[in-house]
């Protein structure tokens, strides 16, 4: 784990200081899901997942409720998801995932950030062969949880990989977690299987996983991280997936 864990830990520690930017982005996803599939989370799986992920980031209930209500407003923005393929220095490639009500504004902002920081926007779909979309679920590792047994139980629902990890906490006490991966088309089946087993999922996402990760030294990593920070500072950017190992 080593360096990879420390890198993730540093990134998470930094995010704790930027919740004022994170909550509006989470709210946008909740509003979009509610507008698409209805305001009732029990009848709208996408909204249910958006709320789950917002709670995982400690988004207050009042903020979540307000985001849902915005979807019912007559003047509710028509928010759409869009992704951009990006090339950066040192062989780094990125999928930049956005949620926006103004594509012209978003593409202009992303291009400006890339142009100022050595990045380049590629033709849409250029990196399809470099990444694979996966369903990813994260939940707490309990003392009585048998991962081998759980793996066997979930294979029929699309599970491809299961791993144990530790998640940094603000109080410094790292927490044992389990992360599972499956085909993105199995997202619903895996979600239902975990629910049926009484496992409380902390985070459920569709992620772009690099097929051939690249290694960077510390200086290169700092430079790319600075670019990622600038992209994530944009109000429309939801996620930045990279091929960094």
Swiss-Prot record:
Protein name as it appears in the record: Probable transcriptional regulatory protein SUN_1622
BP GO terms, sorted: regulation of DNA-templated transcription
Major localisation: cytoplasm
Cell compartments where the protein resides: Cytoplasm
Cellular component, GO annotation: cytosol
InterPro entries linked: Integrase-like_N, TACO1_YebC-like_2nd/3rd_dom, TACO1_YebC_N, Transcrip_reg_TACO1-like, Transcrip_reg_TACO1-like_dom3, YebC-like
HAMAP family: Transcrip_reg_TACO1
Similarity section: Belongs to the TACO1 family.
Superkingdom of the organism of origin: Bacteria
GO MF annotations, alphabetized: DNA binding
Alphabetized NCBIfam families for the sequence: PRK12378.1, YebC/PmpR family DNA-binding transcriptional regulator
Keywords for this protein: Cytoplasm, DNA-binding, Transcription, Transcription regulation
């Amino acid at each position: 784990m080593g360096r990879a864990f420390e890198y993730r830990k540093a990134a998470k520690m930094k995010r704790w200081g930027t919740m004022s930017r994170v909550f509006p982005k989470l709210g946008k996803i909740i509003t979009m899901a509610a507008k698409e599939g209805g305001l009732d989370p029990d009848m709208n799986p996408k909204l249910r997942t958006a709320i789950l992920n917002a709670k995982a980031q400690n988004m207050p209930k009042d903020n979540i409720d307000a985001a849902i209500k915005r979807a019912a407003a007559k003047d509710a923005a028509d928010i759409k998801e869009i992704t951009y393929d990006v090339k950066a220095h040192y062989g780094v490639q990125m999928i930049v995932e956005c949620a926006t009500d103004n594509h012209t504004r978003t593409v202009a902002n992303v291009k400006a950030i890339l142009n100022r920081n050595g990045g380049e926007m590629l033709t849409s779909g250029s990196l399809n062969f470099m990444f694979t979309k996966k369903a990813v679920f994260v939940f707490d590792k309990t003392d009585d949880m048998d991962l081998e047994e759980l793996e066997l139980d979930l294979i029929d629902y699309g599970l491809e990989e299961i791993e144990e990890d530790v998640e940094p906490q603000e109080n410094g006490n790292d927490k044992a977690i389990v992360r599972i991966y499956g085909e993105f088309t199995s997202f619903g089946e895996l979600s239902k299987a975990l629910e049926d087993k009484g496992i409380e999922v902390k985070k459920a996402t569709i992620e772009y996983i690099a097929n051939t990760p690249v290694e960077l030294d510390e200086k290169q990593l700092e430079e790319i991280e600075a670019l990622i920070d600038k992209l994530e500072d944009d109000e429309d950017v939801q996620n930045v997936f990279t091929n960094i190992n």
